[in-house]
Amino acid sequence: MEELIWEQYTVTLQKDSKRGFGIAVSGGRDNPHFENGETSIVISDVLPGGPADGLLQENDRVVMVNGTPMEDVLHSFAVQQLRKSGKIAAIVVKRPRKVQLAPPQGSLPVDEDDRAFEVMDEFDGRSARSGYSERSRRSSHGGRSRSWEDSPERGRPHERAWSQERERSRGRSLERGLDHDDDYRRPRERSRGRSLERGLDHDDDYGRPGERSHGMSTDRGYDRGYDRGYDRGYDRTYSPEAEYGRRTQPDARHAGSRSRSREHLRSRSPSPELRGRPDHAGQPDSDRPIGVLLMKSKANEEYGLRLGSQIFIKQMTRTALATKDGNLHEGDIILKINGTVTENMSLTDARKLIEKSRGKLQLVVLRDSKQTLINIPSLNDSDSEIEDISEIESNRSFSPEERRQQYSDYDYHSSNEKLKERPNSREDMQNRWSRMGATPTPFKSMGDIASVVGTENSKEPRYQEEPPAPQPKAAPRTFLRPSPEDEAIYGPNTKMVRFKKGDSVGLRLAGGNDVGIFVAGIQEGTSAEQEGLQEGDQILKVNTQDFRGLVREDAVLYLLEIPKGEMVTILAQSRADVYRDILACGRGDSFFIRSHFECEKETPQSLAFSRGEVFRVVDTLYDGKLGHWLAVRIGNELEKGLIPNKSRAEQMASVQNAQRDNAGDRADFWRMRGQRSGMKKNLRKSREDLTAAVSVSTKFPAYERVLLREAGFKRPVVLFGPIADIALEKLANELPDLFQTAKTEPKDAGSEKSSGVVRLNTVRQIIEQDKHALLDVTPKAVDLLNYTQWFPIVIFFNPDSRQGVKTMRQRLNPTSNKSSRKLYDQANKLKKTCAHLFTATINLNSANDSWFGSLKDTIQHQQGEAVWVSEGKMEGMDDDPEDRMSYLTAMGADYLSCDSRLISDFEDTDGEGGAYTDNELDEPAEEPLVSSITRSSEPVQHEESIRKPSPEPRAQMRRAASRDQLRDSSPPPAFKPEPPKAKTQNREESFDISRSHDYKSNPSAVAGNEVSGASTRSCPPPIAAKPSFGRSILKPSTPVPSPESEEVGEGSEEQEGAPKSVLGKVKIFEKMDHKARLQRMQELQEAQNARIEIAQKHPDIYAVPIKTHKPDPGLSQHTSSRPPEPQKGPSRLYQDPRGSYGSDAEEEEYRQQLSEHSKRGYYSQPSRYRDTEL
């Protein structure tokens, strides 16, 4: 005889961008079924390859969508609920199924649809089905129904399936997808406070009469006169959706319970001992849990179990708000937390959800009047239970379609050294649980297989709780007493062991920074075992390293790095109960990081990410090996996978930074080339070449440890995009109470440049006024703001098109002279290179000005949101950040050694004179550039002339770098005589003018400071004292005058105003200078002769050479025949420091120099004269 039953499932679907949820629905109150008039919402089609493929089937009845019942609703209402579900929809469906009341002895073929479903990870939202099934004796959408599955937590005490293993999650999420291979022989899951959802096979679900399949006799199960106690009992398969679905069916309370224990899920040939046992369901209630044994006869058989979980209130504080409210009780099952369904939610996620409630916690609970969950008795562990755990594999997946490979544990000793198997393999099993990430680690040992074989041969049912195996008691041991300081820090119940490290420490570790580091296994015969360390001990300190809050990878590396033979001092504390809870819940590492480099996907299980993404690391020793972390991507969609560990990440980041630096060097070269060139085309070309290498360097490490916190101050605001300058001005003008523009200042105190940097002190002062600081800075400065913990709100205006930018700017700022093409290109480059800095993006629409309202709303929303802040100070930030980064680079300043015009969206004409704007045509290439505003990155026209590609002016630029000349903005007045006076000067005036400048007495100093590039002889002639008014115009016949000469002194011809050519002026001054030089040389010669005559007259006073001086014949042609004029003592201006020429050789050398200058003429080497800066 067949009877129709209904199995209920909860499915979580993720919407595909192209195919939606991949289902079609029909039915409804306004569209009943044409044959039987059924008004249920029915799945009419499932798209192959879609999100629902394999999860939903045709003719499934939709019971609930995201908590909204779908019973007796309109078709349009159901469609609307699916459409507004967003990206994720939790759908509860019921599926019809016919069963045989008296099944044949042979087992039916296993239906593919009844196989155990792949269980999603706690962060994977693809599939979460509740294994609720009910039996209906009426039509497909109503009637009295009976549950064919039961939860051990909510069942009657004697109906609960208590698996005898260490898996006591106590309210934790523990979902297990059980696969087909024989690694799933005897799964035992005891989850305190969790429902274990199970999908059962044909041959086991509705098994033989007398067999205790799932803790209930099938004869009694199909008998309509079943025990009335079950008729009044709970439906033990609980999930929020299933509970709501049962509320809509009045007779769903008639549920026959099934024990979830695996010990009564039998194979095709049931045990005669079990069939001969009296029906346990008919026995009175008992608090004693039952044991169930499942054994496979074939490798492809399934257990058919799906494990679920639910959160309940375990304890309430008497003085807390929950107790005072009076609506909550211990044992209540929490269905929703602030609107989020808690089915299969882990305690960690539930805690975070409560922490984010911000003072308002809304709960939806189900009252458990029997308080079944909190009355669960504690059970002791047995050896066989621990062995059975090794065969339970968690099919957690990184993505819905990928299965995680079986894990292996990491040995902390050498690779060729393995921990020995314990006789009872109990400790070995717990050792294998040392990999504590987000999921438990599956293990299999030979002891487990032997246990299975022995049990199968004995054919003894294990439905009773076996007494716990006696724990071996260690001999009394006296531990070292910790120091008083350690006792004060770590507590009094600590023990200290000290031993010498051998080949390895001999320890396996479990846990992580979230729960602590625990000893998960000890190698036999090692010093650690001999000194009394035990499994379950929490390691608090090793030598001088504090292990509290240490991630498991760092703990492993620290133990490995201890040299062999060195003393190891371990401070530990026995916490076996906490250790068992850690093994049960799978907790270990848990911290958040933000990436500051880019990583591509290496393996199918890896995650690809870019800069600025946030991850939660749940295991730093994935698969028991160093090199990868198991992490969950934090964002709109949660995704789990592998990322490089810290050391590998730093290597990858350093390579990327080096590549960026090399690209930056090329950019600097092209920038300087563009600045040296005065041609517009070359300048534009250099900009285009430069933009390809633009990238933002950072001071952050590869991984930055972050925490989610609320900003307690008004965060600065930085805007990027083609209308950012207009937006900044508009915010400052219209909302002065909320926004204030941070003024830019010159970087150097004495600089006269109009723009430069924004001081951090300025930003701080604006924040102290409770206002948002509006910053006009570069992307690199934004990175510095984040580094200094200011967390700016960075908003990017995304333009729709170049024409749209032009239209908006002409409407918002008609007087603007910026190029829309350039602004549009810069916005696209920013979006490619600096998108990780943006906290929000506003899409511009040139047809309206709604962007301003969006801008204000975005800033307000961003200010109220929590931000990812650095967990601690960055390295190098121990000092006051003002000492290291006291300013931010303004948009007008150079950015990354590049022309800021490549990045800046806040420029005016930028030296382009309208030729690069939307309002004027291009000017000729030779037209000088006109800048409307002077800024640090924009040279003015005068400075542009410096960069003309002429080799001689560049030489003058180098020589013009004399400290005296740069220090003094203008030369002394004596060096700027009026040209007419210079023409009529007599010899005495020329002499006075030449002597009026205060020269240093040392000729070498004169040559070093003022005759740059001249002769390097030790005693040059004092001809450098000639007037310099002719120097500024004595240059090659180039059309561009030397800027240095213009800065040092104005040319005489500019003051004269005479309409003479440059060549004529040069000839005039050449004649004048030549005449003055000859006169000066003659005066010096006469003075020297006078000194010699005086010395010869008074030999007792002056020491002079005896040899008579022979005058230079070349000099006589220039000397005058007039008698020497009497002069005063020689001026110190031209004297040697010794007072006179101390030797005849020096005097002779000096005269030869004068003669050589007379022969060559002063302008025989005009470049030497041009290089003289006076």
UniProtKB/Swiss-Prot annotation:
Keywords on record: Cell junction, Cell membrane, Membrane, Nucleus, Phosphoprotein, Repeat, SH3 domain, Tight junction
One Gene Ontology MF term: cell adhesion molecule binding
Domain SH3 per the UniProt entry, residue ranges: 588-653
PTM annotation (Phosphothreonine): residues: T439, T889, T909, T917
Biased composition, class Basic and acidic residues, residue ranges: 125-137, 146-214, 220-235, 243-266, 274-288, 399-430, 940-951, 978-1000, 1150-1159
Subcellular location: Cell junction, Adherens junction; Cell membrane; Nucleus; Cell junction, Tight junction
Chain positions with Phosphoserine modification: 107, 127, 130, 140, 145, 147, 151, 173, 195, 217, 239, 309, 382, 384, 390, 399, 408, 414-415, 483, 686, 886, 897, 904, 950, 962, 970, 990, 1052, 1131, 1143
Region Disordered, annotated ranges: 125-290, 391-430, 456-490, 904-1065, 1100-1174
Pfam family, one: SH3_2
Oligomeric and partner information: Homodimer. Interacts (via PDZ2 domain) with TJP1/ZO1 (via PDZ2 domain). Interacts with UBN1. Interacts with SCRIB. Interacts with OCLN. Interacts with SAFB in the nucleus. Interacts with USP53 (via the C-terminal region). Interacts with claudins, including CLDN1, CLDN2, CLDN3, CLDN5 and CLDN7. Interacts with CLDN18. Interacts (via N-terminus) with CTNNA1.
Family of this protein: Belongs to the MAGUK family.
Name assigned to this protein: Tight junction protein 2
Source organism: Canis lupus familiaris (Dog)
Protein encoded by which gene: TJP2
